[in-house]
A protein has these predicted regions:
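Bacterial N-terminal signal peptides
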Residues: 10-18
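Intrinsically disordered, low-complexity Ser/Thr/Pro-rich tracts
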Residues: 1, 17-23
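Bacterial extracytoplasmic/cell-wall-associated proteins, especially those involved in peptidoglycan
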Residues: 24-145
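Bacterial N-terminal signal peptides that target proteins for export
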Residues: 1-8
Length: 145
């Protein structure tokens, strides 16, 4: 009986260990980071999907630009608008389905503005404007290059 319990324990352990030992894939980490950043900017308010895509597109443009860090994580943490001023804020974010959907669409190559020069989103005018979106609560946000 004791041997049977040990065998069952080892069998269960062998089934659990491989999944626990596998690290998160880089693509999954990038998806999670992008969804969190999109949600940090748009999750509190019901912005349209186009707005979510534009926010994410700016982040991906920054990663591709020589003016910014080379990784999504570094770009996000370099700007308080995404990670917040409070330590642990960004880590505690749980993106909603719409943020994940926007991240998935962007990582699959979809673009709304389709202009790699667009590196800023702000209510103030910074350079040329590629796209402006209006929300009655937040006003006009411009996506600039």
């Amino acid at each position: 009986m004791r041997r049977l319990r040990i065998l069952i324990f080892l069998l269960i352990l062998s089934l659990l260990l491989p999944t626990a030992a596998i690290a998160q894939e880089p693509e999954d980490e990038e998806r999670e980071l992008l969804a969190k950043a999109i949600y940090a900017c748009t999750g509190i308010v019901s912005f349209c999907d186009e707005w979510r895509l534009c926010i994410g597109e700016v982040l991906l443009n920054r990663v591709a630009s020589p003016e910014f860090p080379d990784s999504l994580e570094e770009v996000i943490y370099a700007d308080e608008r995404y990670c917040g001023k409070v330590e642990g804020y960004f880590a505690a974010i749980t993106p909603d389905k719409r943020a994940y959907a926007a991240a998935d669409r962007l990582l699959a190559g979809e673009r709304v503005m389709n202009d790699p020069r667009v590196l800023w989103q702000d209510e103030h005018l910074d350079g040329g404007v590629c796209k402006s979106l209006y929300d009655y609560r937040w006003g006009t946000i411009r996506f600039c290059y």
